[in-house]
């Protein structure tokens, strides 16, 4: 459905309702991709990989390699205690000349974890990750970890929504769009 509003905004809504088209002051069309963390988790899954603070960094790096992820949550007594990433390993172990086999996760993990709820928008998450220079966001509701999203997950989401929007626009223009 194509509608207009006072700000010369046109919204093209289709089953996923993941895009809005805006016309700027010069009449140039701009596509805004929308969506929530919940949408990403439904698509990617909510499997969470973690380590305990008392495991060695070597064990954490092995697990990251085994699961093909760049970060692991650190769980202690069933609660989120921190996050450890490849970046933590590089900066706090390799560059300091430490051994990953004798250094514990609790010594290098990031304890102050930035997290979001599943209702946060993709845009809000991208902004939060960019401002804080982080690559992974735990998704938490009522102190329960629901999943983790990476900047790569957000980029994949945006690209897929752009492709879907282009397809719908092409169908709309060619009159093949359902009314």
What spans do the regions from the language model cover?
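Tandem CBS (Cystathionine beta-synthase) repeat/Bateman regulatory domains
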Residues: 2-179
